[in-house]
């Protein structure tokens, strides 16, 4: 987030906290009072239009977050459990194959 966006956001929060209507002029005057000079007027206009008619405190209190995951179907859980059990059996089979390859005499130094 740029300095312009941060300054305008903080100014909007200050105005909302005081219960003052958020307008571009009030945002700009608050930013100038804070001696922040690099904020272009477009930012204050955009923020004022975006927050027009909205309760900023209500927006902050109702910030949504990612909800919990949906419960998995039972069939999927059973498939995962079976998949977890299957690799153990496959590992034993692979070890037996490796031993049989060594007995065939394909080594370099035999």
UniProtKB/Swiss-Prot annotation:
GO terms for molecular function: protein kinase activator activity; ribonucleoprotein complex binding; structural constituent of ribosome. InterPro entries: P1/P2_N_sf, Ribosomal_P1/P2. Phosphorylated. Transmembrane segments: none annotated. Residues 87-110 are annotated as: Disordered. Keywords: Allergen, Phosphoprotein, Ribonucleoprotein, Ribosomal protein. Belongs to the eukaryotic ribosomal protein P1/P2 family. CDD domains: Ribosomal_P1. The keyword Phosphoprotein applies. GO terms for biological process: cytoplasmic translation; translational elongation. Pfam families: Ribosomal_60s. This is Large ribosomal subunit protein P1. It comes from Alternaria alternata. Plays an important role in the elongation step of protein synthesis. GO terms for cellular component: cytosolic large ribosomal subunit. The keyword Oxidoreductase does not apply. P1 and P2 exist as dimers at the large ribosomal subunit.
């Amino acid at each position: 987030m740029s300095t312009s966006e941060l300054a305008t956001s903080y100014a909007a929060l200050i105005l909302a906290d005081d219960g003052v209507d958020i307008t571009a002029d009030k945002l700009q005057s608050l930013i100038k009072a804070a001696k922040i000079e690099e904020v272009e007027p477009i930012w204050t206009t955009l923020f004022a239009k975006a927050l027009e008619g909205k309760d900023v405190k209500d927006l902050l209190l109702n910030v949504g977050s990612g909800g919990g995951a949906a419960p998995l179907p039972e069939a999927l859980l059973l498939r995962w459990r079976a998949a977890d059990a299957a690799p153990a059996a496959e590992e034993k089979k692979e070890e037996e194959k490796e031993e049989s390859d060594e007995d065939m005499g394909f080594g370099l130094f035999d």
